[in-house]
Every structure is written in C-alpha cells, then in structure tokens.
Amino acid sequence: MQLEKMITEGSNAASAEIDRVSTLEMCRIINDEDKTVPLAVERVLPDIAAAIDVIHAQVSGGGRLIYIGAGTSGRLGILDASECPPTYGVKPGLVVGLIAGGEYAIQHAVEGAEDSREGGVNDLKNIGLTAQDVVVGIAASGRTPYVIAGLEYARQLGCRTVGISCNPGSAVSTTAEFAITPVVGAEVVTGSSRMKAGTAQKLVLNMLSTGLMIKSGKVFGNLMVDVVATNEKLHVRQVNIVKNATGCNAEKAEAALIACERNCKTAIVMVLKNLDAAEAKKRLDQHGGFIRQVLDKE
C-alpha cells in the first residue's frame, strides 16, 4: 500500500487552518477529532471480542500475549504489558511488549529500526516464541516491516496472530489471522499517527488485556482482586476492594488481608465463607482462582 493512499496519511479538512486559530479553537479542533475515535473502535468491537477469546484460550493453555510494534505503537504495547503485573498480579513474562530498536527506542527514535524485518523476527526468537503464544502486531499504518515480518514468523510457528492498524486492507491486517482495524481518518496534523490512531490503539489494547484478565478470574464484579500492593495507595485500595466485595468494615478487611499475606481473593473468600486463610486459599485453588465459582458452587 502506497503511503500517500493511506487514510492515516490523508489531509484533514477540519484542521487545514489550525495554525491560524486561537489556542482555545486549536484545542476544540483536536478535541472534536478525538471524539470520533471511540466510535471507530465501537465499529470493530466484534473483532476485538474474537481476539480476546483467542488470547484467553491460548493463555489458559500456557501461552503468552506478545505485543510487537515500532515507535508509538511499540511504546503502547510496552505500556499495556507493564501494567498487567501490578494491576492483576500476573507474572511479568505473561504479557510482553516488544519495540523495534529495543529498550533504547522506548524514549528515543531509532533510525531504521521499524524497517528491519530481521529485527522483528529476531526479537520474537529472543523471547523464545512458541506456538502457544499469541502475537499482536501493532502498526497504525499497517505497513511496518518489523511488525509484518514478526507476524509472518509467528504464523510459521503456528501462533495465533492479531493485527491492529488504522488502514483497511493493510499488510498487517492481511498477514494476521485476526484483523482489528479502527478507521479513525486523517490526523489533525497530517501523518501524526500518535494522535487519533495512537488513541484508538490504546483503547483496543486496554480491551484486549482487560478482557483477558476478566476471563481469567482476575476481576470479581468490577474489582481488581489480584492487585499487588506495591505502595500505600494500593494498600488502601486492597482494603476497599475487600470491603466492597463483602460488605465488611475496614478493620475486618485489613485483618483478613494480614492473615492471608495481602491476597484480596483469599481475604474475600475468608470473609464471605467464614474460613481461615489456608482453607480459603485451598478452595480458590480448587476453582482455578475464580471467586465466583467458589461462591456459586459451595
């Protein structure tokens, strides 16, 4: 696909005079364009749901969720991956973010990195990619060689693959088994795909990882019951989670958390089923960590 024919490279009539307007009007133009992004994502919800189901199936069988991208797309994948361990208590290697150019590229532009097909393949090899893993290629343009080669290699291994781009019919979309293509239109600043396209990608990644965690029993109601208390704010959040899930007071919630080494799931089952920490943990283990199953089946 030629660059000049891509929707993400088009000229946006709404911002054609943005360099001549007031600061407030400038903000209004950008905000009005940003409002269209959730609607674009809404149109591809069935595709996102299908991807979540596949990701969950693979991860449940021992696989990992691997994001691969360049520039903004790569950084968004790393951001999403890095938030999963503290929010949901998963091991750091379960959700992985890869970026063209490596760690240095998180904060700096690395010349030519996104054009390296070899780089995409090697980065996946270096993390020991297996057929059980799911590889999600992220590229606003849908034409990034680093990402396309990574998806091709993943498919050769037998991996399930997902391609996220903002240009219909792009190479990323056609290479991946599942395509998620929120069409956000031309950017306010022509070609600046870190804007609407980047926002759309972030919304999609939010759904992929959150959907995976919900389906994996990491959420009870709408509470993040596997949150790791790495700071004072999260200690307080744990207490509030146990309170909200059980209706108990703060003192009882804190006592239960202390008794089970600050595991919200165990504390919730302790309070709701009137169990000690060991028995509550045992029942959770018997039901794969799903609080709902412990409560519904016992």
Curated annotation (Swiss-Prot):
Residues at the active site: E83, E114
Major enzyme class: lyase
GO biological process, one term: peptidoglycan turnover
E.C. designation(s): 4.2.1.126
Xref: InterPro entries: Etherase_MurQ, Glucokinase_regulatory_CS, MURQ/GCKR, SIS_dom, SIS_dom_sf
Superkingdom of this protein's organism: Bacteria
Keywords: Carbohydrate metabolism, Lyase
Catalysed reactions, semicolon-separated: N-acetyl-D-muramate 6-phosphate + H2O = N-acetyl-D-glucosamine 6-phosphate + (R)-lactate
GO molecular function: carbohydrate derivative binding; carbon-oxygen lyase activity; ether hydrolase activity
Extra remark: A lyase-type mechanism (elimination/hydration) is suggested for the cleavage of the lactyl ether bond of MurNAc 6-phosphate, with the formation of an alpha,beta-unsaturated aldehyde intermediate with (E)-stereochemistry, followed by the syn addition of water to give product.
Assembly behavior: Homodimer.
Function: Specifically catalyzes the cleavage of the D-lactyl ether substituent of MurNAc 6-phosphate, producing GlcNAc 6-phosphate and D-lactate. Together with AnmK, is also required for the utilization of anhydro-N-acetylmuramic acid (anhMurNAc) either imported from the medium or derived from its own cell wall murein, and thus plays a role in cell wall recycling.
HAMAP family: MurQ
Name of the protein this chain belongs to: N-acetylmuramic acid 6-phosphate etherase
Lineage: Bacteria, Pseudomonadati, Pseudomonadota, Gammaproteobacteria, Enterobacterales
Protein encoded by which gene: murQ
